[in-house]
Amino acid sequence: TRYDDVNIGGAINICKCAEKFNINTIIFTSSVAIYGFAPKNTGEEGAPNYFNDYGRTKYEAELIYKAWQKVDPDNRSLIIIRPTVIFGEGNRGNVFNLLNQINNKRFLMIGSGNNFKSMAYVENVAAFIKYSLDFGTGVHIYNYIDKPDFNMNLLVKTIRKTLFNKNNIGIKIPLFIGMSLGYIADLMTIIFKKKLPISSIRIKKFTSDSMFTSSIDKSGFIPPVTLEEGLQKTLKYEFLEDNKDKKIFYTE
């Protein structure tokens, strides 16, 4: 798969280059996707339980980098950062898709909305990567999450308040109806061999808790931007200002 080529093939190539040019520090941005549908508040000690090729290849790449570090542990530093879902200005990932649906008034809340979603603002992730350059030798593994977590009701309400000055969530539909629509979409995908924007797995992911913890606080790192500030900056940049000519980035 493309993930095998990029994550596993990329890890092999990077380790070869590090060997060739005597580079002793590697920072790898992995993902909390290695944990799959993890229990709430899963930390760095959580067991790998990935459910797709993205999570699998991120985890297998981690093992490749660990093997590289193990060859010369007294001199080599490996930093593995496992971010949760990342958002920010110009980022075209899953959070942007949600923001865009709400902005275009095409969003329906499925389920109670009481499930929590850990998120990470891109500026903070970049700041932590820079901060980690000073870590010593060894293997350093961190989840990256900006706290406190929003539940879906609060997240959607905050977005609608900023975009429409409305202090509500909008239309809700029960979970069983949402899942039924997802299974119908799965069947249509099989019949017509064409991926649809909705699926049972996407609805399950949307309505499940995706809440992680991190030991980053122990490293002394302080995020430069709060989660709510990052969300407000992103909404303003994407929907309240004219930034159509600015660069955009497509991510998983």
Protein language model regions, located:
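Flexible, glycine-rich beta-alpha linker
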Residues: 35-36, 76-97
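Active-site Tyr-X1-5-Lys
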Residues: 51-79
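Active-site loop of classical SDR/Rossmann-like NAD(P)-dependent oxidoreductases
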Residues: 152, 197-214
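Conserved Rossmann-fold NAD(P)-dependent oxidoreductase catalytic core, especially the SDR/UDP-sugar
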Residues: 12-54
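Substrate-positioning beta->alpha
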Residues: 13, 91-97, 110-133, 140, ...
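Active-site beta-alpha turn of Rossmann-fold NAD(P)-dependent dehydrogenases/reductases
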Residues: 27-31, 82-84, 145
